[in-house]
Amino acid sequence: MLFRSVVILILPLTAESRNLFDARRLALMKDGALLVNVARGPIVDTNALVSELNSGRITAAVDVTDREPLPSDHPLWRAKGVLISPHVGGNTTAFEKRARKLIESQLNLLAEGKPLNNVIVAGN
């Protein structure tokens, strides 16, 4: 399958990010786009996502949902064009080694009084 664009959500759940991908933002995605959520479930408005999926306009792969475990009767299970994994996306053989290396690097920068990597500033 060829996707016109891929949106990957990798961010923490905060007051600002809750329902960040609501019906309005989902509607801004290109036809044929793929939404991948490996962040936190409540970042995506699940009802709006189900509507978009069932329209066939976009597809999605979600490793997280706004209710975990997702109830067996939840409409997301029956939505078109969705892959649901059981919150295991970050569990790889390389994860711990890379995470330790990143944390060590950030702590060294902090101790040296240097700017940290990967800092997100509100409003930018």
PLM feature spans:
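C-terminal helix-to-coil terminal segments
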Residues: 68-124
